[in-house]
Amino acid sequence: AGVVKARNEVFVTQDLTEKTHYISSTGIGGRHADPKVTVQMDTYAVDGLKSEQIHYLYAPTHLNPTYEYGVSFERGTYVDYGDRRQVFISGTASINNKGEVVCPGDIRKQTERMWENVEALLKEAGCTFDDLGQMIVYLRDVADYTVVKGMYDERFPDTPRVFVYAPVCRPGWLIEMECMGVKSLENKEFAPY
């Protein structure tokens, strides 16, 4: 809750609101191997983009806007270049378009619903799971690792991924994933990446 509150407060100071858009992101607490490290963050930024290169993803048939339940991030974003489309899917869980947890207590069904939600976001970007270059999967309970890893091995045998033991945002969520991908395309309006 502290990370969510702090992120919301900082974003307002930077004019990041539901009216101006947020960033695609995943904010999950964890623990660094060094107990002196209290915060760590990875970022990706590109200078010189035109606003028409950036597109936000919603998948309203599956997901609701995040600000409706008090958090501030975009569900996903894609950026078009002259030679490719990059897609960034924020941490996505087993949720419906009313903001409710779907399939509480069932790791298999939550994983399937989460994939359905991610697929809806990718489809909106004109992409599929085949366009993904990497996935990060967050598990609330390490006991679910064997089941979930088996599901991923079967469905995504060639996609690089890492599993992280971390407290997923809501207590009812057992799993969450974020991912990034690239799709080849030709767009003469923009410079190549």
Predicted features and spans:
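N-terminal presequence-like segments and the immediate start of the first folded domain
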Residues: 1-134, 138-193
